[in-house]
Amino acid sequence: MDRIGYQYPLTLKMFLDYGMIYAPNQIIKYRDQLQFTYTEHYNRVKRLSNALKSLGVRPGQAVGMLEWDTHRYLEAHWAIPLYGCLFHTVNVRMTPQQLIYCINHAEDVVLFVNEDFLPLVESIQHELKTVKTYVLMTDRQGEISTTLPNVIEYEELLRQQSEDYEFPEISEDSKATLCYTSGTTGNPKGVVFTHRELVLHAISVCMTWGLYPWGLEIKANQVYMPLTPMFHVQAWGVPYFAFMLGCKYILPGRYEPDKILRWLNEEKVNFSHCVTTILHMLVFHPDAEKYDLRGWKVCLGGAKLTRQLAERAWQLGIRTQSAYGMTETCPAMTTGQLKPEHFDLPMEEKISYYIKSGIPFVFSQAKVVDEDFNELPRDGKSVGHVVVRTPWCTHEYFKEPEKTKELWKNDWLNTGDIGYMDKEGYLMITDRSKDAIKSGGEWISTLTLEDAISQFPAVLEAAVIGIPDPRWDERPCAFIALKPGQTALAEDIRDHLLRFANEGKIEKWWIPDLPQGYIFVDSIPHNYIGKVDKNVLRAMYAEKAK
């Protein structure tokens, strides 16, 4: 029987429309330079949609952007998908060769480029096969000098357009955004999300982080500062529902720790999300204690939230909570949420839950399986492969059907991560499959070791890799960066880990061997999305072992 009535499409316009109904006079602020009301922002979004039409862009085509976290990026997050185009959020930290691949693979017809990235784009322009127009973006007045062809400045483009625009009715299954994985092996893979997937993810995040006590407790009218780059999986979808909630936006542009600390204090920011390296940079900043950061709540992803980092944040009045996911899951899908029986625990014990990979978001499922896809016991020790499913997991690697098939098995998405479930239903990620250490046939959790080492007072950061061993196949090796002015010996770190083993927090046989299992370095290398680059560490070890 045919359904009767209007089939309401779940598109991003829902968030935009409701924000305009609820809080048309709320403020979107960009650094110390500009601010707009929601109404002014909405009119600029309509101008940008008209601009796409004036540039000859057709619905279904891809439009790319290289930009910091600015008001322009927020405008594009609405205008480009709602025009019916595929919004390619270009990762500005990729290598030139990766950028060439991604822009050509996406077939971007228009490329929006911040002035800071002009030298990079100019150097590769002759290898970009599909770009017809470049839109240049700058914070300053005056003309921009460039060798790029067919250019127009962003504000001039908007000035030429009318605010009179009716967003077309598009299918909720229309492709809305495209972002590329980090590509640590081979070319990056393009991950596509539809309007429906983005809407359902944003609603779930809004509910999970907003409705439950002792979490992030995101509410309407709060102050929001994104500290995850907006090119990274739509800044976790938070900019969408923050508009619906009528939140005040503080957009930081290019990240500068001293300025971010000042804005957090002056604007009384309520909530943010970021990778652990950003929070580490802020809470260990020499001036961190000069600012009142009490009441700021932060969700962390990209790498394990260590106890050291969570406790340092708590000392400054900052509540932290981990989240787990990947590009293909949009990204967040589990979070270190407290349950009612945890509400009255002392903060030290609450932190033990905040730093876990967590329980699934509303509408999400996760389990741990063995090699034959049998679910493993939720006993806190049975380690296996983490598989997930949600209404918003990607169903497409862009133009790569075979890799898409590999991503899904038995209707579950294979994350490529290793972990376990505890008796309370909390997921703990112990490793990426490619980073996992199997010593004598048993798993060693590098993330747990890294967390333990980081709690040594002199340690700034630690990373653990597997190294060849003739007897056990692999053994762990810890790379350790110390805090400025601090000293420590390998024996000190080993004794510290022995105390953890004696307390039952790690297995004794996990402890790296002396002397080869401890390497002190000036800093731990990170890739362009802020994750520890273990390929570099493996190369460093191989060079040292020669």
Regions found by a protein language model. Name each.
Residues 365-387, 423-424, 486-490, 533:
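Conserved beta-loop-beta connector loops within the AMP-binding
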Residues 37-40, 176-204:
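Conserved AMP-binding A3 loop
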Residues 55, 66, 357-359, 378-379, ...:
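Conserved ATP-binding/catalytic segment of the ANL
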